[in-house]
Regions:
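N-terminal Rossmann NAD(P)H-binding glycine-rich loop of SDR-like oxidoreductase domains
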Residues: 3-20
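Adenosine-cofactor binding site in Rossmann-like domains, unifying the SAM/SAH pocket
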Residues: 21-45
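NAD(P)H-binding glycine-rich loop region in Rossmannoid oxidoreductase-like domains
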Residues: 40-77
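Active-site "gating" loop of Rossmann-like NAD(P)-dependent oxidoreductase/epimerase domains
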Residues: 61-64, 69, 101-123
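NAD(P)-cofactor binding segment of oxidoreductase domains
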Residues: 69-97
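NAD(P)-dependent short-chain dehydrogenase/reductase
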Residues: 134-181, 187-188
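Mid/C-terminal beta-alpha module of Rossmann-like enzyme folds, strongest
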Residues: 192, 199-241, 248
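Conserved C-terminal active-site "lid" loop/helix of NAD(P)H-dependent oxidoreductases
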Residues: 214-216, 220, 236-275
Length: 277
């Protein structure tokens, strides 16, 4: 089996490649230079030449606020490039794993979103990822759509690194407490994605670590595990206005993982502890 991983220098792609190599599965990771999501011909030629059995599509435009001003670029990368990648997967009979997001939902209420609940993205980024999902479903039969949220890992920027860096120069921080969701540890997710790649249990899944929290709760746990004494004050989202609307409710049900026989990811607190080891 051969697996192609897009965006392998990013947070998730980095750990997916590492997990595949640990399992002795032949794989290749793509960079922007050799596999440009804005150059359809180059992208298709790369896939046809490598002939993967599975494409794990981690590469994405993720600058949520910037996307409000770069609508076309965001759509090109998250939607149109995904559509073209799905087409070449269809031609080469490759499975495709598309990484999506909680942002496809409205992000209101307090219930856990099921995979087939109504989609109502509230910003440009969320709409582009939903359009990518729809393209994959329209073109392919052999696909996995995996929705995640609040991603963290050892490679790249994330909330944990931001908090720890801020703590170096501040003795007091304010963190939003009215956005609720679940962190996703890239190492745990990479294991699940590799399990999916080896299966034919196609469909849409939610795959965050177990448990829910607010960003404030997350920050408090980060400092607790790092043994950093700092005053963290909870504040509403209105204290930090952003160009793009953020979901207040990112709770996502993982029933589909259970139904398919996939293991759920460990508790987010345990994942954080694992990262700190």
């Amino acid at each position: 089996m051969k697996i192609l991983v897009t965006g392998y220098t990013g947070q998730l792609g980095f750990d997916v490649i590492r997990e595949l190599k640990a399992r002795n599965i032949e794989c290749i990771g793509t960079t922007r230079n050799e596999f440009s999501l804005t150059d359809t011909e180059k992208m298709q030629a790369f896939v046809k030449a490598y002939k993967p059995d599975v494409v794990i599509h981690c590469a994405a435009y993720t600058a949520v606020d910037k996307a409000e001003d770069e609508v076309e670029l965001c759509d090109q990368i998250n939607h149109l490039a995904t559509k073209e990648l799905a087409k070449v997967c269809k031609k080469t009979d490759a499975k495709m794993i598309y990484i999506s997001t909680d942002y496809v939902f409205a992000g209101s209420g307090e219930n856990f979103y099921e995979v087939n609940d109504e989609k109502a993205p509230q910003n440009v980024y969320g709409k582009s990822k939903l359009d990518g999902e729809l393209a994959v479903q329209e073109i392919l039969d052999k696909y996995f759509i995996v929705r995640i949220s609040w991603v963290f890992g050892s490679n790249g920027k994330n909330f944990i690194k931001t908090m720890l860096n801020l703590a170096k120069n501040h003795d007091k921080l304010t963190v939003v407490n009215d956005q609720i969701g679940s962190p996703t540890y890239t190492v745990d997710l990479a294991k699940l994605l590799c399990d999916m790649a080896l299966s034919d249990k196609y469909g849409i899944y939610h795959a965050t670590n177990e448990g829910i929290c607010s960003w404030y709760d997350f920050a408090c746990e980060i400092f607790k595990q790092a043994d950093i004494k700092i005053n963290v004050k909870p504040v509403p989202s209105t204290a930090f206005p952003t160009k793009a609307t953020r979901p207040h409710n990112s709770r996502m049900s993982k029933k589909c993982l259970d139904k398919a026989g996939f293991n759920r990811l460990p508790a987010w607190q345990d994942a954080l502890q694992e990262l700190n080891r």
